[in-house]
Swiss-Prot record:
The gene is Nubpl. Disulfide bonds: none annotated. This is Iron-sulfur cluster transfer protein NUBPL. ATP binds at residues 75-82. It comes from Mus musculus (Mouse). Pfam families: ParA. It comes from the Eukaryota.
Amino acid sequence: MGTWRRLLLFGGVSLRGGGAATVPPRGCRALGCGRQLLGAESEALKQRRTQIMSRGLPKQKPIEGVREVIVVASGKGGVGKSTTAVNLALALAANDSSKAVGLLDVDVYGPSIPKMMNLRGNPELSPNNLMRPLLNYGIACMSMGFLVEETAPLVWRGLMVMSAIEKLLRQVDWGQLDYLVVDMPPGTGDVQLSVSQNIPISGAVIVSTPQDIALMDAHKGAEMFRKVNVPVLGLVQNMSVFQCPKCKHKTHIFGADGARKLAQTLDLDVLGDVPLHLSIREASDMGQPVVFSQPGSDEAKAYLHIASEVVRRLKSSPE
């Protein structure tokens, strides 16, 4: 990286202000003049770096009333992350009826929780002017989808998205929750970083299909959480196998055990396998998640097992 480019990045461009980048006088080619400029640039660069480093990372602040935060993430879209988040929340409650569970949708551009949890309407405000989550199937839910029209696209820049995330994190009255499941957007961008740096997260669950292209991005997602000191609880291998409803023959449409190979590479465990099954898709589209509507099915049992593994790892993780 050249000197002038470094100065533009660290010295001249800042959301919080700062001096403009120094530009050498036109036609100035004298060696002494150049050395003076380089010396000035070097000193300005050092000062700017010191200013940036002194700010540090945002101080993490727990969400009031929430004991454990579990984020459900994926490296890419279309792997069943939101379906996993919804059914994980329901499974956590089903496995232990004494536990209060919430579900937070921070996928601002593509919120899925309202549809999957069969919820509509706007949140009411508490006396403290905080939004109250909408409730269904015993799960308290909050999503940007409750605040905008279902078909209205959000054409927002990054700062507006970050402001919305801040409101979803800090301006919701959750009451007392044992578990808050957070449905992340796909990828490893601003939202993931902002959430990870602003609230204490008990653990991350990475969702992937067994195919190589999805596993590549899942690898990146797991590494990102490790870099921001978020414990990765394990991987969920979604759409692991398809069983023909007539002949019962099993086919690994997306490949076999790809997530297990990745888990070995990352020194992680696979929390469970979820089959590719029509009932999961139909139940989600109807707003009746399979853990609620078909609790005795093999599909629901897969999510119940995953929830048990998540809780076991939370209990064994250091405080």
